[in-house]
Amino acid sequence: MDILERLEHFKDYKYMKRNQEEEIRKQEAIVHACDAMHLPDSLKNQLFQDVQEAKGKLIAIELEEQREGQELESFLNEYIQDDRIRYILCRHYIQQKSLLEVSKKISLSYGYTKMLSSKGKQMVKKVVIE
């Protein structure tokens, strides 16, 4: 893979993590709804297990992203001799990552129930765009 392909591939992790986090929020909402409806414990346990598996997948994605990021950084250091270009590429990667972290913190502090509403999604989008 060339540099641009590696950078583009690395950006895919952001979307994979976002999709997995959304799936976890949906599954947790289902578990809470089942709790409120006083459904059988066996069903609750199965749903809780599904949430734990989804969280495990998220951790696996994050570990793979970290490994890929380290490989990308060493690749950039090895093949790009110009410090300015390497700085710009790394800075772009860091900005992408920090924007995602800020939006995640806002969504967590705002609460996932509000996040599921359109108003919550617009709020996070505004922060990311600015």
Region roles according to the model:
Residues 1-78, 130:
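N-terminal interaction/assembly modules
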Residues 68-72, 81-85, 116:
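N-terminal positioning helix adjacent to the helix-turn-helix/winged-helix DNA-binding module
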Residues 79-80, 107:
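Short, conserved sequence motifs enriched in acidic/basic residues, glycine, and aromatics
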Residues 81-97:
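Short amphipathic alpha helix immediately N-terminal
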Residues 88, 128-130:
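N-terminal functional module detector in eukaryotic proteins
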Residues 102-106:
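Short alpha-helical "recognition helix" segments of helix-turn-helix
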Residues 109, 113-127:
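DNA major-groove recognition helices of helix-turn-helix
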